[in-house]
């Protein structure tokens, strides 16, 4: 947020107290233009124990509130403050009372609770990060006595795989997070979901040619190169009533992987990071009508050929097998794609 210009004293004799936007007299010629407080990094694990098959959700939650009053800042008056420790307790109590279905629905419930419970709260912002637990999976392979190794009673067979009923493995492929903002003066709830840290690499079918050729250029045309990136992506929903948040997150992830990798046997050509990014964003808007705008960043993680020319006596010929990973510096490509005539908070 840009700072507002400093206000000048009203007369030459000195400054008089200013009046803030909520009508409260402030002690100096300055005013608080943004404020809020909350509890961050509240870790919660919820276990659903419906029969022998258990389901878990582990979150890291942040809750921030904005009050109508600023008297806690100006006067040191804490009478309107909902303590951050109370906000922490609210996370656990609502998880116990209502359970957890998805990070977005839990964040919506938390935000709405703060506005319903405390009339002096103007805005609630809830941030949730999901810990990626998946069920332990055991393939249905035949043992010496021709018995499937996944025949234990603690496993449920799905698609020739045995999924454990109550054991899980941490699989940090990508982070699922969301931000929910609920304002008392705005009937529309802001729900933003994201993917963070989706690292991918392919060894062929990526090129970069015919770019600007001038006196500053040293990079040759690259007709076939390693393409690696770490995708960060976020999108905002225009409709939160009809969307399945968990399914939508998985759909976006699958779309990104499909446009990056293509068919498992054939692959797909990537003439630039920009084009791959755009195709992914476009397909998300095509497939999920509740998404109004999507933003994506793809840093270009470089892998350069190790130069074997000085070592022809040891390894004669060209090298297309050994590469040097170079994290810094790296290119960064990003774009935001939106439906026409919409406003967003991305």
UniProtKB/Swiss-Prot annotation:
Family recorded in the similarity comment: Belongs to the uricase family.
Gene it is expressed from: Uro
Enzyme's top EC category: oxidoreductase
Annotated protein name in UniProt: Uricase
Region Disordered, residue ranges: 1-23
Entry keywords, A to Z: Oxidoreductase, Peroxisome, Purine metabolism
Tissue specificity: Malpighian tubules.
Motif (Microbody targeting signal): 344-346
GO cellular component: peroxisome
PANTHER family the UniProt entry points to: URICASE (PTHR42874:SF1)
InterPro entries assigned: Uricase, Uricase_CS
Organism lineage string: Eukaryota, Metazoa, Ecdysozoa, Arthropoda, Hexapoda
GO molecular function term, any single one: urate oxidase activity
Biological or metabolic pathway of the protein: Purine metabolism; urate degradation; (S)-allantoin from urate: step 1/3
